[in-house]
UniProtKB/Swiss-Prot annotation:
This is Probable ribonucleotide transport ATP-binding protein mkl. Keywords: ATP-binding, Nucleotide-binding, Transport. The gene is mkl. Residues 16-252 form the ABC transporter domain. One of its GO terms (molecular function) is ATP hydrolysis activity. PROSITE patterns: ABC_TRANSPORTER_1, ABC_TRANSPORTER_2. Belongs to the ABC transporter superfamily.
Length: 347
């Protein structure tokens, strides 16, 4: 594992290069030919309707599931083709926050958090204690280390799971629906915590979520799975100003669009919905935001997020290739330098 730099922060996390990835369960194709580069040291979000294989994708990235085609390059190693020993070593780069926290019910929070250190390192118990207490303090659980998972709230279990994901100083952090089971207030706290962690260790973070507010305000990059394919992946500014129908529908939580209750809609259904909309029928959904919603910033006193400058440089290079309307909205955002913290922008 890389050493901490002179500014007290870990070096930038590593990139993840996915090429031509295809996964099936028996005769059921989950997704095919998925290709994307997840930038190092940035926060990315993967969106998509239920059943599109987002969690399957996450599990594939750490080698828990094996796609039948394609490659996943992490720190120069293809984890699909590498040996079991190489995969074991690559996994030490990862910290994973599972959807349910995945805590051991028979262990208190201290032992749950210490588990990866005892399994993957030869550190003395005194060293383990220092690390565990530091991570629990980081996620706001200092003083709760003797409590058991059954004695605490769902939000606290999420934070305990995040503390455990951080104990090996990972360069890549995967979060599987971190907001699942949380109310909007706890979700806002968790969003702020993720941004603060990225500022401190510059890790590569990938979040799978259905939460529209997280999608709009947290990530540097966004991607969306639909119809067994990756529809788009890129900087937040590009997707938030995109006219791609499925992206617009999902980000605004509308019924009107290609996504149906259980499957994609046919053209006649979409035409009927469009007619209802033109007739003044209110279709529900989230408040539609014009332009680019501001991104959550770090808590005052934290280091600046290096990811912001890297992403904005890529966006400026892409501007000439984007539609005029998107260019104007993105330039307004870049020049306006919109910044806020999670508690200032709720659901």
């Amino acid at each position: 594992m890389a050493a901490i730099g002179g500014d007290g922060r870990m070096p930038m996390g590593v990139a993840i290069e996915v090429k031509g990835l295809t996964k099936s369960f028996g005769s059921s194709r989950i997704w095919e030919d998925v290709t994307l580069d997840i930038p190092a040291g940035e926060v990315s979000v993967l969106l998509g309707p239920s059943g599109t294989g987002k969690s399957v994708f996450l599990k594939s990235l750490i080698g828990l599931l094996r796609p039948e085609r394609g490659s996943i390059l992490i720190d120069g190693t293809d984890i699909i083709e590498c040996s079991a020993k190489e995969l074991y070593e690559i996994r030490t780069l990862f910290g994973v926050l599972f959807q349910d926290g995945a805590l051991f019910g028979s262990m208190n929070l201290y032992d749950n958090t210490a588990f990866p250190l005892r399994e993957h390192t030869k550190k003395k118990e005194s060293e383990i204690r220092d690390i565990v207490m530091e991570k629990l303090q980081l996620v706001g659980l200092g003083g709760d280390e003797k409590k058991f998972p059954g004695e605490i709230s769902g939000g606290m279990r999420k934070r305990a799971g995040l503390a455990r994901a951080l104990v090996l100083d990972p360069q890549i952090i995967l979060c599987d629906e971190p907001d699942s089971g949380l109310d909007p207030v706890r979700t806002a706290y968790l969003s702020q915590l993720i941004m603060d962690i990225n500022a401190q260790i510059d890790a590569t973070i990938l979040i799978v979520t259905h939460n529209v507010n997280i999608a709009r305000t947290v990530p540097d990059n966004m991607g969306m799975l639909f119809r067994k394919h990756l529809v788009m992946f890129g900087p937040r500014e590009v997707l938030l100003t995109s006219d791609e129908p499925v992206v617009r529908q999902f980000l605004n939580g509308r019924r009107i669009g290609p996504i149906g209750m259980s499957e994609e809609k046919d053209e006649s259904t979409m035409a009927e919905e469009a007619a209802l909309l033109e007739a003044g029928h209110y279709a529900g959904g989230a408040e539609e935001v014009e332009g680019v919603p501001p991104q959550i910033t770090v808590t005052p006193g934290m280091p600046k997020r290096k990811a912001v400058a890297r992403r904005q440089a890529r966006v400026r290079a892409m501007l000439p290739t984007l539609p005029k309307g998107a260019q104007a909205a993105i330039l307004d955002d870049l020049e306006g330098a919109h910044n806020y913290q999670a508690h200032e922008f709720g659901d």
